[in-house]
Amino acid sequence: MTLPSIAIIGRPNVGKSTLVNRLCQSNDAIVFDKPGVTRDRTYQNASWAGREFQVVDTGGLVFEDDSEFLPEIRTQVFLALEEASLALFVVDGNQGVTDGDLSIAKWLRNSACKTIVAVNKCESTSLGVSLASEFWKLGLGEPYPVSAIHGSGTGDLLDLVIDGFPKDLNVEDKEDKIMMSIIGRPNVGKSSLLNAICGEKRAIVSDISGTTTDSIDTLIKKDSHLWKIVDTAGIRRKKNVKYGTEFFGINRAFKSIDRSDVCVLVIDAIDGVTDQDQKLAGRIEEQGRACVIVVNKWDLVEKNNSTIYQVEKELRSKLYFLHWSKMIFISALTGQRVQNIFEHALSAVTQHRRRVTTSVVNEVLKEALGWKSPPTKRSGKQGRLYYGTQVKNQPPTFTLFVNDPKLFGITYRRYIEKQIRLNLGFEGSPIILLWRGKQQRDLEKETSKKNINIIQKD
């Protein structure tokens, strides 16, 4: 079952995204004093008077101009209206009625979707009524003055929105969502991949770098699992990013990585792994996210029977810190292997959430010690690994208790991680090993005993 939705529609720069943030009580929609900041339609959840619904932010609608992305933006607005339960037509009270407003109003009058006119930038309540009265001429009923910046009038507006929803529309069941972020440099095919996954033109696609300026959320049901898929803005080198739309979009993309259950890192099969790809991979590993590496544009590569193995070896040598990730080769354009992404992403999320009993962990460690003893230093002191336990998941984290962490070099630590993976799996997920010395362990035990004594005395 789906939530009712309202489509926010209007000319460029009338304050649609600011109003979206006000209605949703968030800062998720990018707000910047420049037309064309919002291009694709973006979704946010909101609630009012105990009723939950979705707010769909759209790009500035212009009918008389076909330059840049305006035709594609129109398509996105049309799709938003098509699926909406109600349209909120936002106009600028300070500018008054414009030819652009009249064109949009004519189009909305021909739509079957109910429309409410919100006259924005009415910061003064008394003046707002006067400013709003001019918009009766749009022929869409009573215009309502609001201030997206200060919030005045938005409560009354939300009451109208709730009353305007169809009474028989079901409210969405509470269901856990798996959040999957599509991450990558500009123009590697992230939006094409989103469209291929959804089976519709969910995002604007072009050869121009930076077409996607914000993170686009899409809900999709796949094999009894509900996925929230986020297409993020392409992330370039910091020195090439100017303050403005791209800056905010990239910050949003980084936040998406941090909040994701699983990241899909998209690599261009033609360009291979760049420095920026490595930095993105490092961010994913640093944040402890599950990951699937997707090599896009595979249809453009000339290949023989060994090409895929050679290319994978080369890519993995540069993405060595994601050695645990599954790598698949796809074509977003033709749809080749696109649906396999869900299978690998679900497996990665499952491994990311896994917990293993202490007894099983120690069986693996015992076997690992049998194959290869801890190193002995020149001083003659040898490392001793007493036992280990999993202390958390997402990502799976293990504490290993030893006599002295300094006696375990990087080579042996990698060996232990390899043995844990070999015996316990965790493909698609990072794992963290915390090495704790005897002194630290004894200190923790002593602290624990003191706490027990304090409790007993009380």
From Swiss-Prot:
Residues 4-169, 178-353 form the EngA-type G domain. Residues 354-439 form the KH-like domain. One of its GO terms (biological process) is ribosome biogenesis. Keywords: GTP-binding, Nucleotide-binding, Repeat, Ribosome biogenesis. GO terms for molecular function: GTP binding; ribosome binding. GTP 1 binds at residues 10-17, 57-61, 120-123. Belongs to the TRAFAC class TrmE-Era-EngA-EngB-Septin-like GTPase superfamily. EngA (Der) GTPase family. This is GTPase Der. It comes from Prochlorococcus marinus subsp. pastoris (strain CCMP1986 / NIES-2087 / MED4). The lineage of its organism: Bacteria, Bacillati, Cyanobacteriota, Cyanophyceae, Synechococcales.
